């Protein structure tokens, strides 16, 4: 039912060029579901139509989508440039230091700013498992990321959110903005900023304590200290 959709589905990622995608986006938007562009080859007109239909966010920006490219003797804008030109569209960055280089992180921050840029781990079940053996023969953990065993491509991230904040700071992003992109901005994009994303009265007490090197010293979820995270005392 409509209530079930609104309560159980918060976000849907799709390629806007797929048949029926724009109509589906309009329906989801009418139910309060966030619709995100994902794994697409859409150029400007396609992204413009997608945004107008309800695709207001971009999943895993730069990954699974082309940038400026050439076809024979002609040159075309890609999804990346089209998203930059769509002022109201928000983005997310897999800022693990591997999926995107520091220069791209700075560019995205400069053009979309902290209000429209959030950080996402895209972490697999192997998050924080660097150096550990895994049972899936198709993937390997190497260089702080999950790769296809044949080294043909990245398979996913193993980063946790603190890694993303450190990576952004190392890339030259102000700490305050890096933290906002990991808290306030994603909460607002997801429509849960009435209870998440800030340390304020009557909001959920989800708190991280970091040291000067931005390593986690303690974590609270809904006001409860997370087991085995407290290294403050």
Predicted stretch roles:
Residues 75-93, 109-121, 126-210:
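His/Asp/Glu-enriched, well-ordered alpha-helical/loop segment
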Residues 213-220:
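Short, Lys/Arg- and Gly-enriched loop/turn segments at beta-strand edges
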Residues 1-5:
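Short, small-residue-biased leader/transition segments that mark boundaries at the very start
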Residues 6-129, 147:
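Active-site core of metal-dependent hydrolases
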């Amino acid at each position: 039912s409509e209530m079930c959709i609104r309560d159980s589905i918060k976000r849907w990622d799709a390629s806007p060029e797929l048949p029926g995608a724009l109509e589906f986006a309009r329906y989801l938007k009418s139910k309060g579901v966030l619709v995100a562009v994902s794994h697409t080859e859409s150029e400007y007109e396609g992204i413009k139509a997608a945004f107008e239909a309800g695709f207001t966010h971009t999943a895993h920006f730069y990954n699974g989508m082309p940038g400026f490219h050439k076809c024979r003797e002609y040159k075309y804008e890609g999804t990346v440039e089209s998203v930059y030109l769509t002022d109201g569209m928000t983005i997310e960055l897999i800022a693990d230091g591997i999926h995107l280089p520091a220069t791209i992180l700075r560019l995205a921050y400069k053009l979309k700013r902290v209000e429209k840029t959030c950080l996402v781990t895209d972490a697999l079940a192997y998050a924080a498992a660097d150096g550990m053996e895994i049972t899936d023969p198709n993937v390997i953990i190497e260089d702080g990321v999950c790769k296809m065993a044949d080294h043909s491509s990245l398979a996913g991230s193993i980063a946790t959110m603190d890694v993303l904040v450190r990576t952004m700071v190392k890339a030259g992003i102000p700490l305050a903005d890096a933290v906002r992109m990991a808290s306030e901005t994603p909460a607002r994009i997801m429509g849960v900023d009435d209870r998440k994303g800030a340390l304020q009265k009557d909001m959920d007490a989800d708190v991280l304590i970091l040291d000067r090197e931005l390593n986690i010293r303690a974590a609270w979820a809904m006001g409860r200290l997370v087991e085995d995270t407290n290294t403050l005392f």
